C-alpha cells in the first residue's frame, strides 16, 4: 500500500549489504558486490569475500544501533557532530526548515493513520505488548505497559486500533504528534536518479549514517511517510522534494535526529 514500487524494500536490502560489508571486517575480510547480476527480478547481489580488509570502526555499533522512535531532547546537535554526519547525509538544523519538516512529517503521518487501507497495513504489522514482541520481534512494536495490560485483558483489540473515532486511537495519535514535533534536526539522503541501483546504494549509505549516529550518542528515526508514492500523500511528497531535492534528484530517506531522552532498543530476531 505505502510502498507501491518497492523502493523502500530495495533500500532495506542496501542496508543489509552494507551491514554485511562492515561486519566482515571484524574477521579481516573485504566484500565486493555484484549488484542485481540478473536484473531486478533475480538475486539482489552476489557477494565475493577476500582477505586483507582493514577493521571498520563502525562495526562495534552494529548490535547497539536502533531506530529511536521516542521524543528527542531540545538540545541542539553540536556542529562537530553535524559535520561528522554530513559525510553521509545532509543535516537540516536551521529552525525555519526544521519547523516546516516537523509539520510536513506530522501531516503525512496523520494522513497515513486516517486512510483506512494504509492504517490497516500498519495495524496488521503491529506487535502489541511483550508477548507479541517477543514472539515476532519485527514490525511496529507497541510496548507501553498500559497498552500491554489492556490488550491482555481484551480491552484493546486490533479492531479498536482501526476505529479512528475510538478514544484510544486519538490518544495514540496525540502521543505520535508530540513525538514528531520533539525533533531538533532532520537527516536527508538524496540520489541523482531513482533506479534500483540508486535505491540499494542509498540503503548502503544510510546504514553508515545510522551507525555513525550511534557512535556519536545520538538517535535517529526514519520518517519515510512523506517519501512514499501513493496518491493520498502526493502533496507532501512534492513539498519535501521542492524543499530538499535538486532537479532530477529523489529524496530516498528522511529522518528525525537528536539526543535521546529514554533510549529503548528496537526488538530484533536473534542471530
What is the predicted role of each segment?
Residues 1-271:
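Acidic, surface-exposed loops and disordered segments
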Amino acid at each position: 500500500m505505502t510502498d507501491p514500487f518497492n523502493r523502500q524494500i530495495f533500500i532495506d536490502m542496501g542496508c543489509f549489504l552494507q551491514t554485511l560489508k562492515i561486519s566482515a571486517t571484524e574477521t579481516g575480510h573485504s566484500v565486493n558486490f555484484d549488484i542485481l547480476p540478473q536484473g531486478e527480478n533475480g538475486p539482489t547481489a552476489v557477494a565475493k569475500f577476500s582477505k586483507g580488509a582493514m577493521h571498520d570502526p563502525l562495526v562495534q555499533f552494529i548490535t547497539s544501533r536502533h531506530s529511536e522512535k521516542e521524543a528527542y531532547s531540545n538540545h541542539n546537535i553540536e556542529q562537530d557532530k553535524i559535520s561528522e554526519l554530513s559525510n553521509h547525509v545532509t543535516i537540516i538544523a536551521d529552525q525555519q526548515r526544521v519547523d516546516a519538516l516537523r509539520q510536513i512529517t506530522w501531516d503525512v503521518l496523520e494522513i497515513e493513520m486516517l486512510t483506512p487501507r494504509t492504517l490497516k497495513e500498519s495495524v496488521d504489522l503491529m506487535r502489541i505488548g511483550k508477548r507479541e514482541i517477543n514472539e515476532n520481534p519485527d514490525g511496529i512494536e507497541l510496548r507501553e505497559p498500559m497498552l500491554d495490560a489492556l490488550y491482555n485483558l481484551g480491552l484493546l483489540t486490533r479492531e479498536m486500533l482501526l476505529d479512528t473515532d475510538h478514544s484510544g486511537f486519538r490518544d495514540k495519535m496525540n502521543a505520535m504528534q508530540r513525538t514528531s514535533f520533539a525533533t531538533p534536526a532532520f537527516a536527508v539522503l538524496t540520489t541523482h536518479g531513482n533506479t534500483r541501483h540508486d535505491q540499494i546504494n542509498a540503503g548502503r549509505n544510510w546504514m553508515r549514517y545510522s551507525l555513525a549516529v550511534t557512535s556519536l550518542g545520538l538517535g535517529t528515526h526514519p520518517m519515510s511517510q512523506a517519501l512514499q508514492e501513493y496518491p493520498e500523500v502526493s502533496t507532501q511528497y512534492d513539498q519535501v522534494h521542492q524543499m530538499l531535492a535538486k532537479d532530477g534528484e529523489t529524496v530516498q530517506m528522511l529522518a528525525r535526529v537528536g539526543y535521546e531522552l529514554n533510549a529503548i532498543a528496537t526488538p530484533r530476531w536473534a542471530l
